């Protein structure tokens, strides 16, 4: 074959490869996304906020694609118009009036038309604080149909829901921002990590959960922490456990250098002050504080190999301080959990963390003061900030922004 012919073939191959690449870079409509998760949700009612951190993270992610709020936070955490196009106040600044977005259709086919095309809220707080609270998914607009069905305005609607087991979301063809790329989302709930990994390997799933600390993402969205649920431990014993933990070794060996060591509930990128919550390991001081400590039952997810190894290491560290933490069934004294950071607004994120901790919370405090109050008494001991982990099939694009997810070539 002549050299010119070879050059022509090479050029043609490169051209067609470029065309294919450009075509693949354009989102395509259609297809079903198959999602498996560990969380088991009873419903998507925004009024029912779960205290279980796994369920809280899943519900906070799914609610906004079915139900929408008057405002939403952008990538920088700033409130932006959503179902409300604008807002104003009365002369006394005691009442705020929100103008409803026109031409918004509910999932049941009816138009969303609030009385006088506006909604009012009596509230004399600064508008910035009101907007940030309204942006929480738990403050979504929900319409109750006569049969009790909850109807929203989001880019997806619920086509089928089996509490705690499975669900199907289908595209809202009449969404005011245009329909999503996917035709539907099939969700399997309550799946353990082993089954999820097997389904991903066999091509039965597109999105699954993965063990903690396996993501290389730089931005951290979850906080690994110890939570004390019973009164068996005193503040001194809880502080002793905090002082006994060798976070440097855990991060280097068990987390393979991933994540950030921190004693704050919120990551540095969100709050800007997490470095203020800092203390050094002090086993000698921990032994003094731990004198007379009773044995504590300790719970963590044994299906997650990384979480299990961290739990075992924490028990060893506590033993060095003279505290016994042994695995227990049922209601444990101590839990090792991943607490989700559900919002780009500090106070909104802390409010949801307070739900996980089952602790009262004041939305009017400054973020630092609110976080300091949650940390007082060592009822929660933050350990690491880690990225949220998923396994994705090769055909998934734009995850986890579900309204913009599309199916490409594997």
Residue ranges and their predicted role:
Residues 133-180, 184, 191-195, 284:
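Gly/Pro-rich hinge or "lid" segments in bacterial periplasmic/extracellular proteins
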Residues 157, 390-410:
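Long beta-strand-rich cores associated with HINT superfamily self-processing modules
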Residues 289-342:
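Ligand/substrate-recognition segments at binding pockets and active sites
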Residues 36-91, 151:
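N-terminal lobe/hinge region of extracytoplasmic solute-binding protein
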Residues 173-217, 221:
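Ligand-site clamp/hinge motif
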Residues 236, 256, 260-292, 302-309:
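Structural transition elements
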Residues 231-270, 310, 366-379:
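Periplasmic-binding protein-like
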């Amino acid at each position: 074959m002549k050299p010119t012919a070879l050059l022509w073939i090479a050029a043609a191959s490169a051209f067609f490869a470029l065309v294919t690449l450009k075509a693949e870079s354009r989102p395509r409509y259609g297809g079903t996304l198959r999602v498996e998760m560990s969380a088991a949700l009873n419903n998507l009612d925004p009024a029912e906020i779960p205290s279980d951190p796994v369920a809280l993270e899943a519900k906070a992610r799914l609610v906004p694609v079915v139900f929408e709020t008057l405002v939403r936070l952008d990538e920088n955490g700033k409130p932006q118009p959503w179902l409300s196009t604008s807002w104003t106040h009365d002369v006394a600044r005691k009442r705020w009036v929100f103008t409803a977005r026109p031409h918004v259709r509910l999932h049941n086919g009816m138009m969303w038309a609030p009385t006088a095309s506006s909604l009012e809220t009596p509230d004399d707080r600064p508008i910035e604080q009101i907007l940030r609270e309204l942006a929480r998914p738990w403050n979504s607009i929900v319409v109750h149909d006569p049969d009790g069905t909850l109807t929203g305005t989001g880019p997806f609607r619920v086509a089928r829901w089996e509490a705690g087991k499975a669900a199907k979301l289908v595209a809202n063809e009449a969404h005011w921002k245009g329909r999503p790329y996917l035709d539907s989302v099939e969700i399997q709930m309550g799946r353990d990590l082993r089954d999820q990994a097997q389904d991903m390997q066999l091509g039965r799933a597109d999105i699954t959960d993965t063990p903690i600390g396996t993501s290389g993402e730089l931005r951290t969205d979850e906080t690994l922490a110890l939570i004390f649920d019973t009164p068996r431990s005193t503040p001194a014993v809880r502080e002793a456990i905090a002082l006994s933990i060798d976070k440097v070794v855990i991060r280097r060996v068990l987390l393979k250098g991933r994540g950030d060591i921190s004693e704050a509930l919120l990551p540095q990128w969100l709050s800007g002050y997490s470095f203020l919550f800092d203390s050094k390991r002090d086993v000698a001081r921990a032994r003094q504080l731990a004198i007379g400590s009773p044995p504590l039952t300790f719970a963590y997810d044994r299906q997650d190999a990384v979480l299990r190894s961290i739990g075992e290491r924490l028990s060893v560290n506590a033993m060095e301080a003279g505290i016994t933490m042994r695995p227990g069934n049922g209601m444990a004294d101590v839990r090792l959990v991943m607490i989700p950071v559900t919002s780009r607004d500090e106070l909104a994120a802390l409010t949801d963390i307070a739900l996980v901790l089952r602790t009262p919370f004041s939305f009017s405090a400054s973020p630092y003061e609110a976080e300091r109050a949650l940390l007082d008494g060592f009822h929660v001991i933050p350990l690491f900030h880690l990225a949220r982990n998923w396994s994705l099939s090769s055909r998934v694009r734009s995850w986890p922004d579900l309204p913009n997810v599309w199916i490409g070539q594997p």
